[in-house]
Curated annotation (Swiss-Prot):
<dbReference type="InterPro" id="IPR036676">
    <property type="entry name" value="PurM-like_C_sf"/>
</dbReference>
<dbReference type="InterPro" id="IPR004733">
    <property type="entry name" value="PurM_cligase"/>
</dbReference>
<dbReference type="InterPro" id="IPR036921">
    <property type="entry name" value="PurM-like_N_sf"/>
</dbReference>
<keyword id="KW-0436">Ligase</keyword>
<dbReference type="Pfam" id="PF02769">
    <property type="entry name" value="AIRS_C"/>
</dbReference>
<dbReference type="InterPro" id="IPR016188">
    <property type="entry name" value="PurM-like_N"/>
</dbReference>
<dbReference type="GO" id="GO:0005524">
    <property type="term" value="F:ATP binding"/>
</dbReference>
<comment type="pathway">
    <text>Purine metabolism; IMP biosynthesis via de novo pathway; 5-amino-1-(5-phospho-D-ribosyl)imidazole from N(2)-formyl-N(1)-(5-phospho-D-ribosyl)glycinamide: step 2/2.</text>
</comment>
<comment type="similarity">
    <text>Belongs to the AIR synthase family.</text>
</comment>
<dbReference type="GO" id="GO:0006189">
    <property type="term" value="P:'de novo' IMP biosynthetic process"/>
</dbReference>
<dbReference type="GO" id="GO:0004641">
    <property type="term" value="F:phosphoribosylformylglycinamidine cyclo-ligase activity"/>
</dbReference>
<dbReference type="InterPro" id="IPR010918">
    <property type="entry name" value="PurM-like_C_dom"/>
</dbReference>
<keyword id="KW-0963">Cytoplasm</keyword>
<keyword id="KW-0658">Purine biosynthesis</keyword>
<dbReference type="GO" id="GO:0005829">
    <property type="term" value="C:cytosol"/>
</dbReference>
<keyword id="KW-0547">Nucleotide-binding</keyword>
<dbReference type="GO" id="GO:0046084">
    <property type="term" value="P:adenine biosynthetic process"/>
</dbReference>
């Protein structure tokens, strides 16, 4: 009797598909390269040579993140070429708030069954995000895990490393009463609040992924899969010429939870709600889901993706510079004295 020979592919892991995928993404990775990158992908580790001569006391800043349940919408729409931009954005926008220039990025992609074409589409987005952020994609991991994920679903994580001079680290310690708060417009929901957004739009409103959102002229997929805005180049430009006291990336927790992360004791942020036009998608969700205002501001970015805390005397010049950088910006409030035990963010 002939014995059956079982292979790794029979168990659900296709090494050949993995090799095909690596060859497909090499041009995408190369497009992100910087002079400091010393090796192509495929090695056991990514090599990046830090030019120590450029810095007096360099400090490496790292960040890791994912894109949450925004992935569920990518699955529904079968659209995978922009979700990688979100992944990069969530990581690099986090590290620039401490003044760090993003240097390199790594990604992790896990799926039940590797589809090289789909996976390459995902990495196309990662590559585009890295180009926007000016960082190199120097490595990653693609895990084929049969029986662990359902159907064609996958999960992603990203890892960014940047550098900042020790004396130029932005930690909020120089924030003082009277500083102005400048909000940089978001491109939409970015990558947070999607569990609530899906519940309201898909369940409560009963819309499908290709249905048009009332009053927007866009489908659910077009609006909710809009990539997260990457603020690296604009923020780095400002840091060269202006005193930025603090920065807050408005992610999960919204304005109410993220601004306090950079405020020193005794300070609060006074946010003027009428100082910017909240994008219509947030109004639609708030009305359809009967969501309280406070819940909106602690779940979604409500149109503000990054907040800068700046000296009052520099606010006007910074606004002019931001306009020249094609950023839509608003002076959304100021820093005020906060009594002990009081809320750190006040909406007025």
């Amino acid at each position: 009797m002939k014995e059956t020979k079982i292979t790794y592919k029979d168990a659900g892991v296709d090494i050949d598909a993995g090799n095909t995928f690596v060859q497909m993404i090499k041009p995408l990775v190369k497009a992100t390269s910087r002079p400091e990158v010393l090796a192509d992908i495929g090695g056991f580790g990514g090599l990046f040579s830090l030019n120590m001569g450029k810095y007096k006391h360099p400090v490496l800043v790292s960040g890791t993140d994912g894109v949450g349940t925004k992935l569920k919408l990518a699955f529904l729409a079968d659209r995978h070429d922009t979700i990688g931009i979100d992944l990069v954005a969530m990581c690099v926008n986090d590290i620039i708030v401490q003044g760090a220039e993003p240097l390199f990025f790594l990604d992790y992609l896990a799926t039940a069954k590797l589809d090289p074409v789909k996976a390459a589409s995902i990495i196309k987005g990662v590559s585009e995000g890295c180009v926007q952020a000016g960082c190199a994609l120097i490595g990653g991991e693609t895990a084929e895990m049969p029986g662990f994920y359902t159907g064609d679903e996958y999960d992603m994580a990203g890892f960014a490393v940047g550098v900042v001079e020790r004396e130029k680290i932005i930690d909020g310690s120089s924030i003082t009463v009277g500083n102005r708060l400048i909000g940089l417009a978001s491109s939409g929901l970015h990558s947070n609040g999607y569990s609530l957004a899906r519940k309201v739009i898909l369940e409560h409103m009963g819309l499908g992924i290709d249905d048009e959102l009332p009053g927007l002229g866009k489908t659910v997929a077009e609006e909710l899969l809009t990539p997260t805005r990457i603020y690296v180049r604009s923020v780095m430009n400002l840091l060269r010429d202006f005193n930025i006291s603090g920065l807050a990336h408005i992610t999960g927790g919204g304005l109410l939870e993220n601004i306090p992360r950079v405020l020193p004791n005794g300070c609060k942020a006074v946010i003027k709600k009428e100082s910017w036009e909240v994008p219509e998608i947030f109004r639609i969700m708030q009305k359809a889901g009967n969501i309280e205002e406070n819940e909106m501001f602690r779940t979604f970015n409500c149109g503000i993706g990054m907040v800068l805390v700046v000296p009052e005397k520099e606010a006007e010049e910074i606004m002019i510079r931001l306009s020249g950088l094609n950023e839509t910006a608003f002076v959304i409030g100021e820093v005020a004295k906060c009594d002990a035990g009081k809320e750190c963010v006040e909406l007025v």
